[in-house]
UniProtKB/Swiss-Prot annotation:
This is Gamma-crystallin-1. Crystallins are the dominant structural components of the vertebrate eye lens. It comes from Xenopus laevis. Pfam families: Crystall. PROSITE patterns: CRYSTALLIN_BETA_GAMMA.
Length: 175
C-alpha cells in the first residue's frame, strides 16, 4: 500500500498531511507544499485540484524541497496513487494529431527523442500497455505528463500546452 506525507515547510517541517489514496482536492489539508516524504508506492502529484496543472512523478524517497521533484512552485492540490503494473509496455507515438504522420512503436524508455528519431514534437499517441511519463526536455527533465492506457488524439489530451516531448519512460514500481 502506498503512503505519502505532504509538509508545508522545507525539510519536512510545519503542518503535514498523510495520504494513502487518490485525492482530487487537497486544499483543505494544507496551504502549500514545500517537502514530501514517500514511504510507499508511486505517485502523480498535480498543481491544481481535479488532477489539473503541472504533473510530478514521485516514488519512494525524500524530497526536502519542491525543486527535488522538479516542481515550479509550492502548489500541490491533487494526487493519484499509481497501481502496481507487472505486464508489458507498448505505446505508439505520431508526429501529427489524430494518429497521422510518421508512427513509431515503443516498448522501452527513450532518454532523447531527437537523437532516437530526429524530431521532438509528438502530437498524438496510443498507449496500449503500461503507464508512461512524457517529459518536455531530454533526460527526463522539464514538465511531466502522465499517460495511462488510452487514446491521446492531441497533445492537450495528456495535459500539455505544446507537442514538445524531449524524453519518455515507463512507470514501474520503485519500492
Amino acid at each position: 500500500m502506498g503512503k505519502i506525507f505532504f509538509y508545508e515547510e522545507r525539510n519536512f517541517q510545519g503542518r503535514h498531511y498523510e495520504c494513502g489514496s487518490d485525492y482530487s482536492d487537497l486544499s483543505s489539508y494544507f496551504n502549500r507544499c514545500n517537502s514530501i516524504r514517500v514511504e510507499g508506492g508511486n505517485w502523480i502529484l498535480y498543481e491544481h485540484p481535479s488532477y489539473k496543472g503541472n504533473q510530478y512523478y514521485l516514488w519512494k524517497g525524500e524530497y526536502p524541497d519542491f525543486q527535488r521533484w522538479m516542481g515550479f512552485n509550492d502548489s500541490i492540490r491533487s494526487c493519484r496513487f499509481l497501481p502496481n503494473y507487472q505486464g508489458q509496455y507498448k505505446m505508439r507515438i505520431y508526429e501529427r494529431g489524430d494518429y497521422q504522420g510518421q508512427m513509431m512503436e515503443f516498448f522501452d524508455d527513450c532518454p532523447n527523442t531527437y537523437e532516437r528519431f530526429n524530431f521532438h514534437d509528438i502530437h498524438s499517441c496510443n498507449v496500449f500497455d503500461g503507464h508512461w511519463m512524457f517529459y518536455e526536455e531530454p533526460n527526463y527533465r522539464g514538465r511531466q505528463y502522465y499517460l495511462r492506457p488510452g487514446e491521446y488524439r492531441r497533445y492537450n489530451d495528456w495535459g500539455a500546452s505544446s507537442p514538445r516531448i524531449g524524453s519518455f519512460r515507463r512507470v514501474y514500481h520503485r519500492f
